[in-house]
């Protein structure tokens, strides 16, 4: 799919939910009195579904906890909240699992018996993030 000369990873419209587009409100809140402009966290989370076909990683069954705040597709879409910003203004990254699924990260395989591994700090990494998969 290409929109405004931007290719969305070569996917076709049929790969997306909701007939090729994602939608979310411009305002969010708990009541008509307590509303604010939508924050980027919810938008980024929903676009994770639409562009990358990623599942929700928060608890959808009410019997577990999902991945919590450890990824954008979990509760991390609400991210850090300072006293001056609304929830979702500073979402967290995609989890390593999500990054692997979309091809943004190739994990370093760690076999049983490996004594140590070194990962570069995120700010020192190349365009591809570093992660490990332990077997």
Predicted regions: what is each one?
Residues 1-135:
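Extracellular hydrolytic enzyme modules, especially secreted metalloproteases
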